[in-house]
């Protein structure tokens, strides 16, 4: 555990020179590979607008791999089942407690499975709704109502849930908003420009928060 923490802190210390983010390849049958253009587009937007230097191509990492400690931000999405083994649960817990940040974006149909698995990772913590006053919604772009609605799905209000450890947000779950769809190439969903821009700006806020906290 100590060596993993040391490695992670070292990697975070060189963030000014190079940054890399990753997509989580999880088991369970859900389509972890959904939205293939979303992270590259978010990276491009951030590098052009908020002075990040993220590598253009995101990595792909499995939850049980020690490689997860190489990435300050790991993104996951999908429409179906998510399943973590005991080793993966321990590895993900250590990752987040050591300074890493995991973000699951519900692509519709993920909710019941993800809630079950997150409870295994943090059995003594509950997902709590993140208030609109939280810094993640404040800068560099302002979202006074909190997480934006990108795709309607069944019309429920968008919500951002989190797990906090020692007052630090370590896990983010974006529900009923579908940020990742908004990050995709314009022709994939034919979203209006302003909707895509709203999604990308919220994504930029997430990365800005991670790199500065």
What are these regions (language model features)?
Residues 4-15:
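Sec-dependent N-terminal signal peptides
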Residues 17-73, 77-80, 170, 178-179, ...:
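Aromatic-Pro/Gly-enriched surface loop or interdomain linker
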Residues 21, 73-112:
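Short alpha-beta junction capping motif
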Residues 26-30, 79-83, 108-112, 133-136, ...:
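Solvent-exposed loop/turn segments at secondary-structure junctions
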Residues 36-43, 89, 93, 111, ...:
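Extracytoplasmic/secreted envelope proteins and their assembly/folding machinery
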Residues 53-61, 104-107, 125-132:
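Surface-exposed patches in mature extracellular/periplasmic domains of secreted proteins
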Residues 64, 155-171:
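Short, surface-exposed beta-strand/loop micro-motifs that present aromatic residues
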Residues 116-147:
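Acidic, glycine-rich loop-and-strand cores that form catalytic or ligand-binding grooves
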């Amino acid at each position: 555990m100590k060596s993993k923490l040391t490695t992670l802190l070292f990697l975070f210390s060189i963030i000014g020179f190079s940054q890399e983010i990753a997509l989580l390849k999880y088991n369970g049958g859900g389509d972890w590979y959904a939205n293939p253009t979303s992270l590259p587009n978010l990276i491009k937007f951030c590098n052009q607008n908020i002075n990040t230097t993220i590598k253009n191509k995101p990595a792909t990492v499995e939850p049980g791999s020690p490689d997860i400690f190489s990435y300050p931000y790991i993104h996951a999405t999908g429409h179906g089942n998510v399943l973590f083994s005991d080793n993966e649960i321990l590895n993900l817990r250590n990752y987040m407690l050591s300074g890493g940040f995991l973000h699951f974006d519900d692509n519709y149909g993920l909710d019941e499975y993800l809630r079950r698995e997150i409870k295994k990772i943090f059995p003594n913590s509950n997902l709590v709704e993140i208030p609109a006053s939280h810094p993640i919604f404040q800068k560099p772009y302002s979202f006074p109502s909190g997480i934006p609605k990108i795709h309607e799905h069944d019309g429920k209000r968008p919500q951002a849930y989190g797990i906090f450890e020692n007052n630090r947000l370590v896990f983010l779950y974006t529900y009923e908003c579908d940020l990742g769809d908004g990050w995709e190439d314009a022709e994939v969903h034919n979203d209006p420009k302003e909707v895509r821009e709203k999604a990308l700006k919220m994504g930029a806020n997430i990365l800005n928060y991670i790199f500065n906290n």
